[in-house]
Amino acid sequence: PNSFLRNAVIGDDVTIDSSKIVESSVGNRSTVGPMSHLRNNTEICEDCRIGNFVEFKNSHFGDGSKCAHLTYIGDSDFGKKINVGCGVVTVNYDGKHKFRTTVHDGAFIGSNCNLIAPVTIGENALLAAGSTITDSVDDGDMGIARARQSIKKGFGTTYKNK
């Protein structure tokens, strides 16, 4: 109910709740919503869970993967059986160029992680909650990146004027 679909391919036994799906596909036995947005060129495979306030753009999300809430996945390739925690963002745009993120099968992405593309997360890797990941993480490894805040005076203005 209350969903908008345009040029969408929807599999069997799919539940879509109050969501928007445009030029994308959702595989068999998957659930989407409420309040999710699947933008152009997104493929959600079979047995996936896309939860509330989740947005995908130009991405692949493999069989059995879950992304339950408050997340942005853009220009990304996610494998099978991946868990994406609340508040995860794939940071795909640096203000001038877009880059891709790749996450391999079985990875666990902790809540409030930022994946700064281009970056690759290995099979069965774990990203600790609250991490900003700027380097690739190998198979089976854990990435943790939490730093103390620092202020760079005037940098915002300098960056915008480049």
Regions found by a protein language model. Name each.
Residues 7-9, 16-162:
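Glycine-rich hexapeptide-repeat left-handed beta-helix
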